[in-house]
Amino acid sequence: MKKQLLLAITLMWAMLANAQMSVQLGYLLNTEKSKVAGVKSSSSYSGFMAAADYNLNLTGALSVAPGLGLGYSFDNSDGAKYKELGLFVPVDFNYRFPVSDGFSLSVFAGPTLYYGLLSKDTSTDPAYNYYDNDNGRFSLELGGGLWCDIKETVRVKAGYKWGLTNNSKIDGVTEKNNCLYLSVGYLF
C-alpha cells in the first residue's frame, strides 16, 4: 500500500512539474436560445471573461487543461438593462501541433460546468432576478476550439461552447446558452 501511494504521489509530482499555467482575458458573446410552445427565439449578449488553467501533459502531444473562469455579459439595448455573471469550470483535452520554432497550434474539446452568480434585468423596479424565478444556476456545456502559443509566452484562444442542459424552470420552456469567445493569455 505504501509503495502504491508513493508511486501515485511521484506520478502526480511529475505531471505537475511539466504543467504550464496560463491566465487569459477576453471577449465573449453569449447566445440564449429558447423555445416556448414550439416557437424558437434567440438573443445575444456581449461581455468579458477572465480565466486561468493548468495544462497537464498526459502523453506526447496530448494534454488536459482544467481551469476556472469568470464571465460577465450584458445588454443595454432597446431599454433593456440585462447583466449576467457566472463561474465556469472547463476541462479541456487538447492536442498540440508544433508548427515552427516558437509557434504551435492546439485543438481542444471538453465539458464545462457553469454556475450562475447573477442574472438580472435592472430596467424594472425592483430589479428582476432570473435565478430566483425562471432559471437554474447550473448548466453543463460542451466546447471546443483552437489556440496558438507564441514563443511559449502568449496564447491566443478561440472557442465555442454549446449548452447541453435546459436552464429554464418553467414547464414547456426550453432555454440553452451557447458562448463564443476569444481570449489572449500569458503562459507561466
Map each language-model feature to its residues.
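Transmembrane beta-strands of outer-membrane beta-barrel pores
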Residues: 27-33, 56, 70-76, 83-85, ...
